[in-house]
UniProtKB/Swiss-Prot annotation:
Keyword terms, alphabetized: Repeat
Database matches in PANTHER family: OS05G0305300 PROTEIN, OS07G0578800 PROTEIN-RELATED
Renumbered residue ranges of the record's region Type E(+) motif: 695-723
Top-level taxon of origin: Eukaryota
UniProt name for this protein: Pentatricopeptide repeat-containing protein At4g04370
Species of provenance: Arabidopsis thaliana (Mouse-ear cress)
């Protein structure tokens, strides 16, 4: 008897300790104490299990919870009211509907807590209809639902009609006075994009706490309504409430999205005044806001005020600089991050690799990749996608393919990255093979980015049959209407010389942007249809859209290709005079080319001297070619001297100089040009061209001697056919 009493007392002691730990939320210690209890060969009783099951639910320890349930059954405690309730809550937490329902149905007595747990289980699983059926059954059995019951039902609501029904339910049962219920409804109205209904509910609430105000402010932040946020901030002050971290965070998010720098600065002042400027999350939000507003110096100043920078603030800074196109500065910040000893996040790695891709720096990108591998960082799919893109942009497709093939999980971005890589490097065959593999091996749907990459490759290769095939895929896949795809189709057909199809695709675009107009104009101009190009430019002006640099470049290029000197000069003059568009280097080069093609060499050189603030060796090369073709030796001599002073770094320019000196019989200068080119280690790549016939692309190089017999035979055949054609006519 003494021993039994001692055991009971010991069990009571452990139960008391376990319940105390559970009430204070120390669930890990609950399980640890239970282990000690078993080690002392003490058996748990009905008072032990509820706390254990609660701990398993809180710590996400399902397997341990299942073993506890087994012990409950072995000990014959399954009919205990509190244990069965805890089991329902455990299974509800893990969404195990069948297990929870089985325990629920076996219960002899059920109160509002059991019903609420079961209702929440169905609602969180998205089965709101069954949850409502349980509410009706609960009411039929005479048990009145409580506010927590409604909160559990709201946890799975995704549709506005369901929310409106539960709102009526809340009014009927008087839960519209419960602030927790009303805050939950406010949040759901905002998530369902019914911010107006949320505002009506907010105004009707008799009581509001900080959660109510922040929910409403976050709702307006999600739709970018800064004016309503300001009104709420003023009302808060009138109610004697001060904004907290969440209030400022939501407001800063909108300021950044709307690029409202003035509002962002005002919020920054308020954050400092209220003493929240020490909050790490708000400092990160300030960095994001300033970067989105294009104020990188201000973002640097905020970053410098953070004593212990975490990986989040470093990553925000790096990715923000990348969005601004400041790749070099992003790499500097990355270097500072490494020196600080901060851990790397996958997002930071992806942003840095993207910076290397933007700079076209293979060495730097490979170094970052090597650093990541040496330090054992695990790369997620977005980071691996960035590496694929970086290596592809740097021309190392073999490395891109290795990374792609070793990926455990590939998303649509992965496939787009590798396909785009091969397409941009004009390896259309491999790009198409990967495209077919994607359709065969995955359930990924063809999207606009995949198609645009392939169409761009077709444009570069002049592969019209393949382009038509991709056009068919676009139609079958229901990708259109999409401005990116439509514009890419116009570009592909234009560059392949199929202007009728380009025009049809252009006409089918419901909303034509400046890029699509520019592509069509350039297409007609390039293929000798300058008059039609100018007609389309006139249509563009009548459409009400304002021409920009893209349009003027397309029009000037068309005039240059078609010898339309007066029209080109007139349009160039109208750029600044009529439209306020300042010409850039490309526009000026077009005018020089226009004058050179019209054999107005002196005018071209005069225009160059008057309009180019910095010397341009490429434009001088255009004039030099025209001089040699038209025998303008005086201008040619001056240009040669100018080009020598610029010390060209391209072999082609030295070759041009050598030919020009030879034409002027300046043999010493010819020798000097070739010697200078050799001393710099420059080599002139041979000229080449390629032709695509019957789906096969063949490349021809200058002085190419392979298959010479076949080439000579074909030339003889063509010569005979031309002679025969001439005699017949």
């Amino acid at each position: 008897m003494i021993r039994t009493s001692s055991v009971l007392n010991s069990t009571k002691y452990f139960n008391s300790h376990i319940n105390h730990l559970s009430s204070h939320g120390d669930h890990k210690q609950v399980l640890s104490t239970f282990s000690s209890m078993l080690a002392n060969k003490l058996l748990p009783d009905t008072f032990t299990f509820p706390s254990l099951l609660k701990a398993c639910a809180s710590l996400q320890r399902l397997s341990f919870g299942l073993s506890i349930h087994q012990q409950v059954l072995v000990n014959g405690f399954s009919s205990d009211f509190y244990i069965s309730s805890s089991l329902v809550n455990l299974y509800a937490k893990f969404g195990l509907l069948a297990h929870a329902r089985k325990v629920f149905e076996e219960m002899r007595e059920r109160d509002v807590v059991h019903w609420t747990a079961m209702i929440g289980c169905y609602s969180r699983a998205g089965i709101v209809g069954e949850a409502c059926s349980l509410v009706n059954e609960m009411r039929f059995q005479g048990i009145k639902p409580g506010p927590v019951t409604l909160l559990e039902m709201l946890s799975g609501v995704l549709e506005i009609t369901q929310l409106q029904c539960l709102h009526d339910f809340a009014v009927i049962y008087g839960f519209d006075c419960d602030i927790a219920v009303m805050n939950s409804m406010l949040n759901l109205y905002c998530k369902c994009d019914h911010v107006g209904d949320a505002k009506d509910l907010f105004d009707q609430m008799e009581q509001r706490d900080m959660v109510s105000w922040n929910t409403m402010i976050s709702g307006y932040a999600s739709v970018g309504n800064m004016s309503e946020i300001l009104k709420l901030l003023y009302r808060m002050r009138g109610d004697g409430l001060r904004p907290d971290q969440q209030t400022f965070g939501a407001s800063l998010s909108v300021s950044g999205t709307m690029c409202d720098l003035e509002m962002g600065r005002m919020l920054h002042c308020q954050i400092v005044k209220t003493g929240f400027d020490v909050d790490m999350h708000l400092k990160t939000a300030l960095i994001t806001m300033y970067l989105k507003c294009g104020k990188e110096e201000a973002s640097y100043r905020v970053l410098e005020t953070i004593p212990n920078k975490d990986v989040v603030c470093w990553t925000v800074m790096i990715s923000g600089l990348m969005r601004l196109g400041r790749a070099e500065k992003a790499l500097i910040v990355f270097s500072e991050m490494l020196q600080s000893g901060s851990d790397l996040s996958s997002e930071a790695i992806a942003s840095v690799v993207a910076s290397c891709a933007q700079l076209g720096s293979f060495d730097l990108g490979a170094s970052v990749h090597g650093y990541v591998l040496r330090h054992g960082y695990t790369l997620d799919t977005p980071a691996l996608n960035s590496l694929i893109t970086m290596y592809a942009k740097c021309g190392h497709l073999d490395k891109s393919l290795v990374i792609f093939e070793r990926m455990n999980e590939r998303d649509l971005v992965s496939w787009n990255a590798i396909i785009s890589g091969y397409a941009q490097n004009v390896d259309l065959c491999k790009a198409l093979l990967l495209f077919e593999e994607m359709k065969f091996k995955t359930v990924q749907q063809v999207d606009s980015f995949t198609v645009v990459s392939l169409l761009q490759a077709c444009s570069s290769a002049g592969a019209l049959p393949v382009g038509k095939l991709i056009h068919c895929i676009v139609i079958r896949s229901f990708i259109r209407p999409c401005s990116l795809v439509d514009t890419a189709l116009v570009d592909m057909y234009s560059k392949c010389g199929y202007l009728e199809a380009a025009q049809r695709c252009f006409d089918s675009i419901s909303w034509k942007d400046v890029v699509s107009w520019g592509i069509l104009i350039a297409g007609y101009g390039f293929h000798g249809k300058g008059d039609i190009a100018l007609e389309i430019y006139s249509e563009f002006l009548h459409s009400g859209m304002e021409p920009n640099h893209v349009i003027f470049l397309a029009v000037l290029s068309s005039c240059s290709h078609n010898g339309m000197v007066q029209q080109g000069l007139k349009i160039f003059s109208s750029m600044v005079r009529d439209f306020g568009v300042e010409p850039n280097h490309e526009h000026l080069a077009c005018v020089v080319d226009l004058l050179c093609r019209a054999k107005r060499i002196e005018d071209a050189f005069k225009f160059y001297k008057e309009n180019f603030t910095r010397p341009s060796i490429d434009v001088l090369g255009i004039i030099l070619d025209a001089c040699r073709a038209n025998g303008k030796t005086e201008v040619e001599d001056i240009i040669c001297e100018d080009m020598i002073e610029l010390k060209p770094g391209d072999a082609g320019h030295y070759v041009k100089l050598g030919h020009s000196f030879a034409a002027m019989k300046r043999w010493d200068d010819v020798s000097e040009s070739w010697n200078q080119m050799r001393s710099l280690g420059l080599k002139k790549l041979p000229g080449w061209s390629k032709i695509e016939m019957n789906g096969k692309t063949t490349t021809f190089f200058m002085n190419h001697t392979s298959h010479s017999d076949d080439t000579v035979s074909l030339l003889k055949l063509l010569s005979r056919e031309m002679m025969q054609f001439g005699s017949n006519n």
